[in-house]
């Protein structure tokens, strides 16, 4: 099943998953585009284009659009990484925080990365406790390679078999 992944309990290709995320209205209307998904789902590259729909009064990208560009990717990556291992998990973005460091007056690039070490930590805690929360950071970088925003996301993962025994 190489190159095939699951989306909403449907088996889809990486290409189709990318297409579905790119036409999802909250991302589409904010001009957020998923450009690349690595074969192993450990990395995703996203672009947030400055456009009429996402500009604020100062003609920079609205902070809510930047925050939206950070939202769905880490949980999606974890879902597919573990689905490829045959492990069904319940995954949520539990918490998020963002720091706006500079006005975003151009297109922003975001690189989401999960390391092999992150996967080992998650697997170990899932095996011992049935659930885990892990933090990740992503930077929103403008065309001059300046970090305009830094977001931290807390991803909650729980073994699906234990959903009745564990709380959120």
Please place each PLM-identified region on the residue numbering.
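Alpha-helical membrane-targeting segments
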Residues: 2-29, 51-53
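Short, charged, low-hydrophobicity "junction" segments
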Residues: 15-21, 46-53, 82-95
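Catalytic strand-loop segment that frames the active site of acyl-thioester-processing enzymes
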Residues: 29-61
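Short structured motifs
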Residues: 29-34, 94-100, 121-123
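Hydrophobic residues positioned within well-ordered beta-strands of beta-sheet architectures
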Residues: 46, 94-96, 110, 134-136, ...
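Hot-dog-fold acyl-thioester-processing enzymes
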Residues: 47, 53-76, 88
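Hydrophobic beta-strand-centered segment that forms part of the acyl-chain substrate-binding groove
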Residues: 77-116
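HotDog/MaoC-like acyl-thioester-processing domains
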Residues: 104-105, 115-168
